């Protein structure tokens, strides 16, 4: 297989990081849809050129393990690998390459003989901040077995969903960023779908929604989002603005809210499904399969499809929830950035002021708590005529031609091709 230029740069960036002795355990930041599987496959193939090398690929759910193993096999058919996952019914630890679920393997570090030389952690943003986690204990045990082991994290966002950077703070597993693939470049070169954004005319009132641990309290958010009139108007707006789009993905503010949205969509004769964390695997997989096949036009999810969900045809995303997590924000938007035949862009309808809160997807950064408590303003403004999200410096709306009055700092609801990029 042959890497794209930016994928090769990511792999080279890793080796340069090690050569420059910047550290042993870096992150590679690869936006959703950039071909992370190919990057992982190349790193593994390079490692296998050194006889006796052992590579371990670790992630948190069996679906990602299957995707990773199948992806490696497709790109590198001669790879000699095994899978260690209770969920997949396989427990093989004696191959040069092992794909393992952290829940299954975290207490088995001393059983991996010889010890791994390289550990690749997929979806690294899901690592908790707490240092007493399965990942930390597992890696500490691996280092006992092989003090020279290197650990590389791959992620679309170099920060956790609930806190700051993965390579900063006490007990951080990672020590830096080896390479960060720019999302704007991928969109400009056609490797990712452009994303356009409209701020919903009907926003969730967050006045009485408290924060806990840096995120909105789920019960408060669910209550605020579940106002019947707000639900009715929100769905009406989604149906209107997504009318010419094929595959709609909706992020809700809770299970009850999801089913309220579903009932409302059905009054518009929209074929819609709901997936939640409490669904059985069989039910969830069937609903997702129906969505991917086109049997369902709309899929509403409750904290389920924010990572590892791959359906390139998604061309409409509705954020019917608010999040203070820039990582979660990027992961949600990322569900629509993959390219697909007949897809020109992905529309993001924001009903939770998330774009205002976090800004453009190529400039999102977690808040630096040490710099003070002020959250500041994201550099976006919304056209009051068509609701397009524009850069704060725009004087004329690129969608409808509305001339902005004196400088504004916030946003409104129509869209243009570059609405979610800073330039």
Which stretches of residues belong to each language-model region?
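Walker A/P-loop
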Residues: 21-43, 251, 275
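Conserved pre-motif I regulatory segment
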Residues: 1-29
